Amino acid sequence: MGKILRRVMMIGGAITPPNIPMDWTWRQMAAEAFWNALQDAGVPVKDVDLVACNYNDRAIADSSPGPQIADALGILPKPVVPVANACAANGIASYVAWNAIASGRCDVVVSLGFARSDNYDAMEAMNSQGNYVDFDYMLGLTHINYGAMRDSLYRRKYNVSLEAAGTWAYWCNWYARRNPLAANYSKPMPLLEELCADTPEAERDRQATNRGGVASAMVFVGEDVARKYTDKPVFFDVAYAFRPPYIGNFFHYPVEGMREYDMAELPGLMAAAREAYEIAGIKKEDINLVQVHDLTAYEGMMALEALGLCELGKGQDYVLAGGMTLESRCPINTYGGGLAFGHGSAGSDFQAGVLENYWQILGKCGERQVKDARVGVNTSYGTHHSLDVVGVVQKGW
């Protein structure tokens, strides 16, 4: 690992509400989140040195988007680093932002992401392009197929109960009813018994809900300039790791740290977590709130295991023992998770967790507020866990 010249701090952020108008272009979405984040941070646009921006390349018609993004945001001639790597790409964009600041080259960087619902091709037609196309397209596999196979193996290998999955979904929905930014905020609260049922309807309710088009932005600065903008800065660190793009290679891939695992574990997330914890200077015992990117309840429990909160196969024990609640040592998914906050792909899947932990540390979360929140961790993934990202925020005052 190279030399880090200074710490990186977060001083503001914003996300668009669910169900923004379908006639908004990606330019409108991106500008909305960008300017709201700058306003939240108290940063004039002239102070921004760089924007790192991720987008869903399958959902916009524009190629070479860097100068187009800079023009839409009103920052020309300042540079934009465009990133496209599926749902967790903002983790990479934030990694770019982090490095620009930690190296001393930039003082103020905005990490921005947006996702517009596919306007040109249906999800079913485009989804295989996010996988290993040479194999998966010919086999007809999509992310949804992968998720079903992964969940089935995880359930059988570790004897995971429907009760645990239903309980996961219940608490995600409980938090979402206390988060005005969540997709399910104003919807009726489901019953635990219904979520634990062995029915197709319950299975669907244990999976992510769609958020529609979404954009979000976060403002990062160097530790030495943070006090210029706020008296409550929050430390930010991030790491990511890759796994083979073809899911057939998820079984005992012959490299260190992966050969002992199969599709029922997340070794890429384990690697990203180790690096993120090291850079942030924390141990897993220091963490007191976690937000995970969960497209299914089972995947959420797998993420807890990969982060080291519990042993492999013991995620269900943590959930059933009340580990997700505000009374636990480390509450989980207080923003509502993918199941109830909503899946936002490149527009929010990484950012939503960072923003929630940031707002929790600032004490701005109302009924879902975690007591004495100091260290928050979040996860995100892309292309069926061939990319895994971990973010860490810590109280900095």
Show which residues each predicted segment covers.
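Condensing-enzyme catalytic core mediating Claisen C-C bond formation in acyl metabolism
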Residues: 1-27, 132-133, 167, 198-267, ...
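C-terminal catalytic subdomain
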Residues: 257-318, 329-334, 351, 355, ...
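Generic structural signal for well-ordered, non-membrane alpha-helical segments
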Residues: 23-30, 34, 62, 66, ...
